């Protein structure tokens, strides 16, 4: 059994790849995988905790990267080192910034699957109405200038954003800090970096330039985008196909870029890895590993990236002829991959 999260293109990708596994590797090795939808990451994690207590766990699950340490330390998920070694997988083929999130105390507990960074999206049609081009939006000063201009000249919002700790972390990283301290025991929000980042957006909110929402209202940002009431927003690279389709349907010019820089460029990474549950009998563990290995190999990584807009987690995938052709067709998809250079 395989537990996955999210609907739309992500759900389609999970179901298609699971079916492909069953028809190929699964058929050859006598393994059949049933994919089961579990809602959001938080909902899935809560169900995993309950299933662990009840000893009714799936065999494989997606796991949002910030939760891997907690589940590993509590013995819920299995270290994968012995399977990796026996399979001879070249772990250097995974981008370092994505691979490290799956490691806890020197052991690997998850392989990168649907991985992402936050990126800047913009409605270039609105920016051009205000006399700017989003391709030139590189710094915090640019961000403020363009956002204010859109608000003053079009009456819309320069930026729409819900309270998204991931985006906040990107801006903190650009100040040489992060939302949490290195031990993840306290926040850095009262540091000079935190005060500067929060103050920057607080001023723009007070001016009516930023349309701000709480952390459960991401749909309201999407509504602003659909209504063409906002010029700039920050979201996952995994949303690229969604916003690209929206722009095509509504007829506005969509652009994407790095998170605007202050002292330097910077970004956290996000998304999910694939993990194996503990407490499984050996035969189930072997089957679970075959599925994880299949889902994260180069060919499936390419398919997942093109289908969903998530990053190609393997170098061999990112450099494949298929991905190169896709990047030619969809240059915006390359932005997040290039931004990995600055990932924390």
Residue ranges, per PLM feature:
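Conserved N-terminal structural module of periplasmic/extracytoplasmic solute-binding proteins
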Residues: 1-73, 85-92, 261-264, 283-287
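Short helix-initiation/N-cap motifs at beta->coil->alpha
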Residues: 37-47, 66, 138-145, 213-227
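A structural signal for short loop-to-beta-strand junctions that line the ligand-binding cleft
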Residues: 50-51, 56-59, 87-126, 157-161, ...
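Periplasmic solute-binding protein
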Residues: 66-81, 97-135, 161-184, 268-277, ...
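Ligand-binding "clamshell"
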Residues: 71-79, 105-107, 174, 243-261, ...
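Glycine-centered hinge/linker elements that transmit conformational signals in sensory
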Residues: 146-149, 185-214, 259
């Amino acid at each position: 059994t395989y537990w996955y999260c999210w609907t739309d293109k992500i759900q389609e990708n999970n179901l298609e790849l699971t079916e492909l596994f069953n028809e190929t590797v699964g058929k050859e090795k006598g393994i059949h995988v049933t994919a089961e939808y579990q809602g959001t990451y938080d909902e899935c994690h809560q169900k995993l905790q309950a299933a662990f207590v009840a000893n009714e766990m799936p065999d494989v699950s997606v796991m949002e990267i910030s939760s891997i340490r907690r589940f590993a330390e509590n013995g819920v998920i299995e270290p994968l080192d012995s399977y990796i070694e026996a399979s001879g997988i070249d772990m250097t083929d995974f981008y370092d910034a994505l691979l490290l999130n799956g490691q806890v105390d020197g052991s690997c507990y998850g392989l990168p699957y649907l991985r992402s960074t936050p990126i800047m999206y913009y409605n270039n049609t609105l920016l051009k109405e205000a006399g700017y081009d989003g391709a030139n939006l590189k710094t915090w000063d640019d961000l403020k200038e363009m956002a204010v201009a859109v608000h003053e000249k079009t009456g819309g919002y320069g930026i729409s954003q819900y309270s998204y700790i991931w985006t906040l972390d990107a801006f903190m990283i650009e100040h040489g800090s992060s939302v949490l301290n290195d031990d993840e025991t306290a926040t850095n929000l009262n540091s000079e970096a935190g005060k500067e980042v929060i103050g920057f957006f607080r001023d723009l909110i007070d001016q009516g330039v930023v349309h701000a929402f709480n952390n459960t209202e991401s749909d309201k940002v999407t509504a602003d985008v659909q209504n063409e009431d906002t010029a700039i927003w920050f979201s996952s690279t995994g949303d690229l196909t969604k916003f690209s389709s929206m722009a095509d349907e509504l007829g506005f010019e969509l652009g994407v870029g790095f998170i605007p820089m202050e002292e330097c460029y910077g970004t956290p990474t996000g998304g999910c890895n694939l993990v194996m549950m503990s407490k499984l009998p050996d035969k189930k563990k072997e089957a679970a590993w075959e599925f994880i290995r299949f889902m994260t190999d180069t060919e499936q990584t390419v398919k997942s990236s093109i289908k969903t807009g998530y990053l190609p987690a393997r170098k061999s995938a990112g450099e494949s002829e298929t991905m190169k052709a896709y990047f030619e067709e969809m240059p915006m998809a390359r932005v997040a991959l290039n931004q990995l250079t600055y990932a924390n």
